[in-house]
Regions:
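Short, small/polar-rich loop/turn modules that mediate ligand/substrate recognition or access, typified
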Residues: 177, 182, 238-240
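Catalytic loop of short-chain dehydrogenase/reductase
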Residues: 139-164, 169-178, 190
Length: 251
């Protein structure tokens, strides 16, 4: 049975493809109007929006915005509210993941990771608060790697940034919880996306797949349902949580 998100408006960053696209499709299938965000994949984003609109459940618009900058994130927020008149659900799916040895880590790498993963989501949340009413939802994306007692090498910046996200969620959950707005972190394990595959050999990809009991990577469509669940009214008592969706990756 579809979850009832009729009348809700959602903005999903980085949603032209991968996990973000699956989230957009699922929220729309459950009745929400969705703002699809892209930076360069205009044709892909428009095709996704058209396919959602053709299904006749939810609605969708595609908005170009560079969410690695605060200005770009605020532009996305403004265009989303302009398109649908309000905001109920804000999902920070866009992210950066680069693995490298410490000797090769640059100041730009550091700034890039913390900008798109931490700084922009924080300040877009700040800008979104006036639009979010009681029952509003803010969802950040972290990673199951922060739970590992033995994190993989060369993921220094990514894991550090996501660790910051998790603490940001804890504090925001209290600050915004007083307004009836929940804030949670979705923590997937390895998911078969371009972001995950980028810079890895097939041997490395298979290594991560073998850490799962089912010996495979997750698909984006296996992550989207938890976002749809947390978006529904019945999930209003779930707040400040790290929700692991990883197939037993680190049990």
């Amino acid at each position: 049975m579809a979850l009832d998100l009729s009348g809700k408006v959602a903005i999903v960053t980085g949603s032209a493809k991968g996990i973000g696209a699956s989230i957009a499709k699922r929220l729309a299938a459950d009745g929400a109007s969705v703002v699809i965000n892209y930076a360069s994949s205009a044709a892909v984003a428009e095709e996704l929006a058209n396919s959602i609109n053709a299904q006749g459940t939810g609605k969708a618009v595609a908005v170009r915005a560079d969410v690695s900058t605060i200005a770009g994130g605020k532009h996305l927020l403004e265009e989303g509210v302009k398109a649908f008149g309000k905001l109920d659900i804000l999902v920070f799916n866009a992210g950066l993941m680069k693995n490298d040895v410490l000797a090769n880590v640059s100041e730009k790498d550091f700034d890039d990771h913390f900008s798109i993963n931490v700084k922009v989501p924080l300040f877009v949340t700040q800008a979104a608060v006036p639009y979010l009413k009681p029952g509003g939802r803010v969802m950040f994306f972290s990673t199951s790697l922060t739970k590992n007692t033995a994190p993989p090498p060369n993921y220094l910046l990514y894991i550090s940034a996501k660790g910051a996200v998790e603490h940001l969620v804890r504090v925001l959950a209290k600050d915004l919880g007083a307004k009836g707005i929940t804030v949670n972190a979705i923590c997937p394990g390895p998911v078969d996306t371009d972001l995950f595959r980028n810079g890895k050999t097939e041997q490395q990809i298979q290594f991560f797949a073998n850490l799962h009991p089912q010996k495979r990577l997750a698909s984006p469509d296996e992550i989207a349902p938890i976002v749809a669940f947390l978006a529904r009214d019945e999930a209003g008592w779930i707040n400040g949580q790290k929700v692991y969706v990883n197939g037993g990756f680190n049990v």
